[in-house]
Design a protein with these regions (language model features):
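Conserved beta-strand-loop-alpha-helix hinge in the C-terminal portion
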Residues: 215-253
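ABC ATPase C-loop
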Residues: 155-156
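ABC ATPase NBD Q-loop/coupling interface
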Residues: 10, 53, 64-79
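Conserved ABC ATPase signature
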Residues: 138-142, 146
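Hydrophobic anchor residue at the start of the ABC signature
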Residues: 152, 180
């Protein structure tokens, strides 16, 4: 259905191509998941399918991308609208009408379909996506999952054979994401639509994919295969697959259900195992003290003895820092003698006659 033949894409001002040597085929009627680290060109690859690359984004596209026999380099996006539908991360950025029903009909109006055909397809899409009760609702009042379903419905009414989605659930909560994924499964299994999608939250999608395309690095050739096999070599994988890799399970689990099935033998092995003994921490040595002097509390084993010198009357010992230089300052002079009390004898003197 989708054929990439030695496809490379280079944008102006970049030293290396974003895509290089892409040569693969996406079969018809399958859900194919595109994975890889950020910045490897996933959105660029999706854009070559819809014709947005290079017609809108610019850049140099070499090689050939064909969808249903049409070359996307020689066919502009409007000439592919009846064949390829595109849904992005933010549906609000693509809506052009105010209500659900009008949005579903807009794409068909642009293609010039007959009014009776438009009405029939709108009703079919409302029922397929569970939007019948929302047909007259303003789009701005819908939840995130409902808006994404409307966005998918708006590109389904022209009956495209290919649906391209760029992280359709990344901005949705888990409940809304489940709504969107349920719709995609119905499109693949009930209508035979070919779905090519990139998704950051792999734990939500990977168990539903028929095949996975891995872009390991910018400009690197992609790798395509079954999800469990690709997850073994992918630099990004869902947590449950990471657990299976650490436990040595083969094939890797792609869902919690798969992990529970694969954990049966692990539970049996751990049933008779005793927990490892915790290593005892040795007691720190007692602090040493100077002979005949009390110790100063400090780090274990490193008590500091107090100075042996005693303070003397009439002398001030300055506290000197570590970096002080030069001789110590002279001692302070002794205090003057105290005068005798008025009307009394002075200190050590005789009482006046």
């Amino acid at each position: 259905m989708i054929r990439f033949e030695r496809v490379s894409v280079r944008y102006e001002g970049t030293e290396r191509p974003t895509l290089s040597g892409v040569d693969l085929t996406v079969p018809e009627g399958e859900l194919v998941l595109l994975v890889g680290p950020s910045g490897v060109g996933k959105s660029t690859l999706l854009g070559t399918v819809s014709g947005l690359v290079p017609h809108f984004t610019g850049g140099l596209l070499s090689g050939r991308v064909t969808v249903g026999g049409r070359d996307t380099r020689t066919h502009k996006p409007r000439e592919l609208a009846d064949l390829v539908g595109t849904v992005g991360q933010d549906p609000l950025a693509h809506f052009v009408t105010d209500t659900v029903e009008d949005e579903l009909a807009y794409g068909m109006e642009s293609l010039g379909l007959a009014p009776d055909v438009m009405r029939r397809r709108v009703e079919e899409t409302l029922d397929l996506l569970g939007l019948a009760e929302l047909r007259d609702r303003p789009i701005a009042t819908l939840s995130g999952g409902q808006q994404q379903r409307v966005a998918i419905g708006s590109v389904l009414t022209p009956h495209p054979r290919v649906l391209v989605l760029d992280e359709p659930t990344s901005a949705l909560d888990p409940a809304a994401a489940e709504e969107v994924l349920a719709v995609l499964q119905r499109l693949v299994h009930d209508l035979g639509t070919t779905v090519l999608m990139a998704e950051h939250r792999l734990e939500r999608v990977v168990q539903y994919a028929d095949q996975v395309v891995l872009l390991p690095a910018p400009g690197a050739a992609p790798v395509m295969g079954p999800p469990a096999e690709i997850m073994k070599v992918s630099p990004v994988r869902p947590p449950v697959a990471e657990l299976g890799l650490l436990a040595g399970w083969d094939p890797l689990p792609l869902s919690v259900r798969d992990a529970r099935r694969g954990a049966g033998g692990l539970r049996e092995r751990l049933a008779d195992a005793s927990p490892p003994e915790t290593a005892s921490v040795p007691e720190p040595p007692a602090p040493r003290k100077a002979p005949g002097e009390p110790g100063m509390p400090g780090m274990p084993g490193a008590a500091v003895p107090v100075a042996a010198e005693r303070p003397r009357t009439g002398r001030v010992a300055p506290l000197r820092g570590r970096g002080a230089r030069g001789p110590p300052p002279p001692p302070a002079p002794p205090p003057p003698p105290r005068p005798g009390r008025r009307g009394g004898a002075g200190r050590g003197g005789a009482r006046p006659a």
